[in-house]
Amino acid sequence: MLSSELTQLLQPIQQFLGCETPDAWLSMAGQSEHLPVLLQDHLICELKAAQSAMYLIRRYAIDESSAEALLLWLKPFEDFTYRQQGDWRDLAGLSLKKSMLPKASSAYAQELIDKMLLLIKEELHHFYQVLEVMAENNIAYTKITSSRYARGLLRHVRTYEPQAMVDKLICGAFIEARSCERFAKLAPLLPKRIADF
């Protein structure tokens, strides 16, 4: 049961989403035997959010050398997640080693860079936090298939600019809002340490 304060905080998110996550999904996801899959899926979603922000910067805002630096920054996270290479503890200290140079031809490049870099840092921090929670609960990382939710939304992205960029940003907003809504509703069903996260 959600507190009245949390219900009030979620109200704008519910209005944006237009429909709530079904109770059947919540009761299934909240079962302790599904905790490993829930955390692994969340881990992958954090990385995909960082990758999406990186794609937007690379596609619309930065020069080639900056794009290469972004790829190198995310590579260890991708290697761990998709190829199961490396030790997750080594991911803690990784950061971007280069300033991002905006494309001269873009009026919004610097603003997009600034906002998306903050988002990438936040998502990679959350990625590492999920790994810590998994370690605390003796949950080993194993590859699982990606959720179909984002793929379903992205099918509706228009193929011409600037509408394609706008559509991708809107899809990202829906994905983030749904994640927020689901975890707020799941929190009372999860162990305290995970609920606090």
Where are the regions a protein language model picked out?
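Non-heme di-metal
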Residues: M1-F197
